[in-house]
Design a protein with these regions (language model features):
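Flexible mid-to-C-terminal extensions adjoining Fe-S/redox cofactors in radical SAM and related proteins
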Residues: 240-324
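N-terminal pre-core extensions flanking Radical SAM catalytic domains
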Residues: 1-5
Length: 324
């Protein structure tokens, strides 16, 4: 699993959770709020704590007269009947990380049979959910096969996100990263055509962003880690992660919250559409300076290849939108 490095055996303390939720769920923040449970490992590792947090969040939202959407990103291996029933009862949005092809999934994540069985249960229970497939050098040339298998095995699923991995360790040089991105675009484009035949929406973050206008790729987040730290990136799920300290801007304790707003603002200014290198880029207002975590993960030369990839897929998406 690509969040494996961020796995932590630490479980958020109940009082810390309540303090964070009390701070976040307030009328002054707007009428519609969203909470997402995700991170290294899986939110379902501690279902009792997950249920406590959800129940308390909905209680607070009702008290504040707010609409609250709750979503969970899970690898699907721990979604038992109790969890499935609860998710259905509460109307919780669900994304399952699933690489579709058995050999790929078992190599990259493991527990294919368990996850596939869980997906079947979700379909039987008429629970809406999305599929997120991580694309690496292992499966980048098998995206058409991925869509064919998805249709064959789970014909009810009509939406899948194919997301290119961000991991420098998988690419020995910039030429290998460019080769990967070129293969991704070629195979993603072909997979979209197959998906269209089956009524499957084949998406991708960069492709979707082509229809958006944004000054910053990712708005800063109020991310609470198991240790009670606050980070600005949803992929920084524990202090075990690389770049944890780069995104750290606060701390939540049982009865207090400390936020360094200057630090937060500095993080927000590290990547946006106003960077000098973005000035003449055609994708400037769609990618919003690019993912800050990607900027930190890749060296300057590697990130140039990442930018080239974003420009190419943005251009393809815009052409597709014109044809539609």
């Amino acid at each position: 699993c690509y969040s494996a490095k961020g796995r932590s055996k630490t479980i958020l303390q109940e009082e810390t959770l309540k303090t964070a939720l009390d701070f976040f769920i307030r009328k002054e923040r707007g009428d519609n709020l969203q909470i997402v449970f995700s991170g290294g490992g899986d939110p379902m590792v501690s279902f009792d704590r997950f249920r406590m947090a959800v129940d308390y969040a909905f209680y607070k939202a009702h008290k504040e007269e707010l609409k609250l959407d709750i979503d969970v990103v899970t690898n699907g291996s721990l979604l038992d009947n109790q969890a499935i029933d609860y998710i259905k009862e509460k109307g919780i949005g669900l994304v399952v990380s699933f690489d579709v092809l058995k050999d790929v999934h078992d190599t990259q994540r493991s527990h294919y049979d368990i996850v596939a069985s869980t997906i079947s249960k979700l379909i039987e229970n008429r629970i809406g959910f999305g599929i997120r497939c991580t694309v690496t050098p292992l499966n980048v040339n098998r995206l058409c096969e991925t869509i064919e298998e998805l249709h064959k095995r789970f014909s009810n699923i009509k939406c899948i996100a194919l997301e290119a991995v961000i991991n420098k360790e998988l690419f020995s040089g910039t030429d290998k990263l460019r080769e990967f991105y070129d293969s991704f675009i070629e195979n993603f484009t072909a997979a979209k055509k197959i998906g269209k035949q089956y009524g499957i929406d084949v998406g991708n973050t960069e492709y979707m962003n082509a229809a958006a206008f944004q000054e910053r790729s990712c708005l800063g987040k109020f991310v609470l880690t198991p240790e009670g730290n606050l980070t600005a990136c949803s992929r920084i799920s524990s202090s075990n992660e690389d770049f944890h300290d780069d995104f750290l801007y606060g701390k939540v304790c049982a009865d207090s919250i400390v936020i360094d707003y200057d630090r937060y603002n500095n993080i927000m200014e590290e990547a946006d559409a106003y960077l000098p290198e973005c000035k003449d880029c055609m994708a400037r207002w769609h990618c919003g300076g690019g993912c800050l975590l990607a900027r930190k993960t890749y060296s300057k030369e590697y990130f140039k290849e990442h930018c080239r990839f974003i420009c190419r897929i943005t251009e393809i998406a815009q052409n597709d939108n014109e044809l539609d």
